Amino acid sequence: MTDDTRAVVLASGGMDSATAAYEAQTRGYDHLYLLHTSYGQNTEDREYECASALADHVDAADFLHVETGHLTQIGASSLTDDSMEVADADTDSDEIPTSYVPFRNANLLSMAVSYAEANDCGAVFIGAHSEDFSGYPDCRPAFFDAFQGVIDAGTKPDTDIALVAPFVEWSKTDIAERGVELGVPYADTWSCYRDDEPACGTCDACAFRLEAFQRIGERDPIEYAERPTYAE
């Protein structure tokens, strides 16, 4: 029987998923089950540390770390393939970036739904936002709507799991503003695609993050090798 106080949160170690966890708590999900995956990404050790820290911050009911090495074997992403370079930031581009991991969210959500069903959770939270789906096809609202249909068709009759993407129509700036309001510990989050410490400051992930903090007038608490001004 589904328990509407329990939710799985896909915890990447980044600021979006951390904010999603705190948002879930404000919506009455008092028992959070955090799922973190390592798939050979360049900064997987740092991301794991941050996801583990988030589990402590929210007093998670459980923290599950899963190795998904098949995404490294598949390759075709600069996050997992050493033959591909992580490109410098181009926040105005509408092209699919080299950091796109083919159909990653379908893989991660499938595991999250299994985890949710096994623990009678009423929801799965993912921190995708509007600036993600401009470049990543599996972050689009239509994808999440379709995946909700997969959940409904493929789980037990007495299972009722909602796929919640609370920020799918929000910008990164909106998320940063909400997170500051909720007291999200952004010092314990990581976004950089290139480096474990300090963050590079020049990849897409760093650029969107820095721009968000600059737009709300807050200093990003993590260290950067470079800290360019992205907000005009």
Swiss-Prot record:
Annotated residues for binding of ATP: A11, S12, G13, G14, M15, D16, S17, A18, T19, A20, A21
Keyword ATP-binding found: yes
One Pfam assignment: QueC
Coiled coil: none
UniProt keyword terms in alphabetical order: ATP-binding, Ligase, Metal-binding, Nucleotide-binding, Zinc
HAMAP family, per database record: QueC
Protein name, UniProt field: 7-cyano-7-deazaguanine synthase
UniProt organism field: Haloarcula marismortui (strain ATCC 43049 / DSM 3752 / JCM 8966 / VKM B-1809) (Halobacterium marismortui)
Lineage of origin: Archaea, Methanobacteriati, Methanobacteriota, Stenosarchaea group, Halobacteria
